[in-house]
Amino acid sequence: MAVRSVLVPTDFSETSDAALHYGTEMALTLGARLYLMYVPGKTGEHFEANYPLGQFETATRERLSSFLTKEQLERLRPEYALRVGAPADEIVRYAELCDVDLIVMGTHGRSGIAHVLLGSVAEQVVRVAPCPVLLVRAPKRAAATQGAAVKVPPAKRILG
């Protein structure tokens, strides 16, 4: 399976930041198109009601771009998307619209009652996504649960 495009949805959490960095490196290594997406969700946790929509889109694009170096921005020329709605639904819709080959997203790894009450956007996406989904945990959580940080080999060796 050739990976020609990678979608990285974010909620600007620590786990999403880790996924964004991982997805960016994969896109660079594989020569894939990169799509960066933000969905504020129904609660609008990061949504500023004071922003007119155009300014909010610009602010979102700038924030997404801030995770990439100038060289990465020039090489990848990412596409940016801002969607409002239920995050899992919007991620899946956008992946279908753009014919994405891989979704790379963060997961909080909740379990038990927190998972039952809060649900999991990542789990919802995995269940209905039109392509494979790679879940990435935040580095601190991964290190805490496994005793040490694990260096991930370059994506080309994994996929190619």
Protein language model regions, located:
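Short, well-ordered secondary-structure micro-motifs
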Residues: A19, H46-E48, V92-R93, V116-L117, ...
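Rossmann-fold cofactor-recognition segment
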Residues: P78-Y80
